[in-house]
Amino acid sequence: MIMMKGFLGFLAAVLLLAVAVPGYADECTNRGLLDTMYCDNDQDLVADNAPAGNCKDPSTLVFTYTPVEDPAVYQDLFSDFQAHMKKVTGKDVIYYTVHSNSAQVEAMRSGRLHIAGFSTGPTGFAVNLAGYVPIAVKGDEKEFQGYNLIMLVKQDSPYQTMADLKGKKVAHTSPSSNSGNLAPRALFPSQGLVPDEDYTVVYSGKHDQSVLGVVHGDYDAAPVASDVYDRMVRAGRVDANAVRIIYTSPRFPTSSFGYSSQLCPDLAEKIKEAFFSYRYTEEMVKAFDGADRFFPITYKDDWAVIREIADATGASYNEEGLKAMIAKEKEDAEKKAKQQ
């Protein structure tokens, strides 16, 4: 029911996307893939800050995190961060619960949401259609939190390069999996290996089953998420000496954090200061797998691999792609309702 409310509430966004909002974007010299509401004159792929006279300086800032099964958990988890944000900006900060990715995009586009954490994929929709400016990812002192796509082969196998897998049997996880299927189909052709053409694809069902299948000799190789593989090694489920990694992709980021480009520049600077001066509570460190801070990123550089995968799989971050996401959310909500 909650998911359906989120879906129905977002239908208004479809109409909103067709409405041109007059303003500074009319003077735009470069827009790129951004909606006509926004401008990208500096060509960093995100919306430029709204100029004085057109920017927003709300008395209360609205924050939310990517939709999850139990929103109350994250509302409590981010309460200390919200208090820090209030101290730095001098403004009240409230948590706004959203029940779908599409509703979250619409909330920022409509001006009801000012600061947010968006999931990896929906970040692209938020940037292009809602004027979202991602600036951080959960991380530590050295790097942002993320994972890589890796190709595993058995240690005693003859396969040393990706080209060696031509004509072999390779386990993908499932058709809808990003790192287990979509990413390999997008990234492997540049390595001279086209799934289904250069090797036979079989679906294992899960990342751990792909890993174990390689170890047991059921598959010649398997593309899997590095974080899943690392957890299996730490848990003793697989011996790292039993396999070899012959390919590692660029790092995939986790959820992004950022703000609306429609906020006044001075306020945006204070929001950035609040993000980067904050250190996670013990509860946050535990919940976010050891991350202890917001690590700075840029959408242009750090989301490049995500955009490449989206383009290669036809999931472009535009209105058509958004409609597809809405349809998928509706389908998932209906399936969930039938199970209850």
Annotated model-derived regions:
Residues 102-116, 129, 163, 207-227:
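Short helices/loops that flank or line small-molecule/ion binding pockets
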Residues 86-97, 189-204, 239-242, 324-329:
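A local structural motif
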Residues 9-19:
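Bacterial N-terminal signal peptides
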Residues 1-11:
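Bacterial N-terminal signal peptides that target proteins for export
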Residues 22-103, 287-340:
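N-terminal hydrophobic or amphipathic helices and topogenic motifs
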Residues 126-138, 232-246:
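Ligand-binding "clamshell"
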Residues 66-67, 141-150, 237-275, 282-305:
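Periplasmic-binding protein-like
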